[in-house]
């Protein structure tokens, strides 16, 4: 497999992994919990999702031909008003990820060396993708942490439980 295909396969896998972490977090939360904030000026899960989705639509719509910071995006608004309910949030979440996956599927050996722009700053394709992968992983980590704080003892872990690494590794290495 050549570098372009391997890289695109790898980032698609990682983006899907972070989407799954978000999906699994949301499945554990109520309508009220997605709106909860730690303090007055902090963001709720719903607001963070609105920001991620706004970023996804801006960055990945016409990825190869337009600046990633679209004139129609209102970033500040993403943090003011959140979704009115969980269903609305999940619908937007799915559309944001679909926009990203659709854009990645257009990439190939013929356009992989193109230059793209984000806020009028030149990026290689891998650099632009890595930038977004880092951005989304940062925010998904926030979503998971808030979910874990809210659920407490009822939280269903999304990773290897404390004290279970040895058993987990035994399964991985003995299979």
Question: PLM features: residue spans?
Answer:
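Short, contiguous alpha-helical
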Residues: 12-16, 23, 31-77, 118-175
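Acidic/histidine-rich alpha-helical segments that form the ligand environment
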Residues: 80-116, 124-137, 142
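Short secondary-structure junctions
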Residues: 26-30, 108
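Hydrophobic alpha-helical core bundles mediating ligand binding, dimerization, or RNAP-core interactions
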Residues: 15, 19, 26, 93, ...
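Extreme N-terminal tail/first-helix region
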Residues: 1-16
């Amino acid at each position: 497999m050549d570098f372009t295909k391997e890289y695109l396969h790898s980032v698609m896998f990682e983006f899907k992994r972070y989407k799954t972490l978000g999906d699994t977090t949301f499945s554990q939360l109520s309508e009220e919990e997605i709106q909860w904030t730690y303090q007055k000026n902090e963001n709720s899960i719903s607001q963070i999702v609105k920001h991620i989705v706004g970023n996804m639509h801006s960055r990945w719509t016409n990825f190869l031909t337009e600046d990633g910071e679209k004139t129609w995006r209102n970033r500040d608004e993403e943090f003011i008003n959140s979704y009115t309910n969980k269903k609305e949030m999940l619908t937007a979440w799915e559309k944001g990820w679909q926009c990203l996956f659709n854009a990645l599927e257009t990439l190939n050996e013929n356009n992989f060396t193109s230059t793209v722009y984000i806020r009028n700053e030149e990026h290689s394709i891998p650099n632009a993708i890595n930038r977004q992968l880092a951005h989304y992983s940062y925010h998904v980590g926030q979503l998971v942490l808030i979910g874990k704080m809210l659920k407490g003892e009822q939280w269903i872990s999304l990773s290897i439980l404390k004290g279970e690494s040895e058993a987990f590794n035994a399964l991985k290495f003995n299979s």
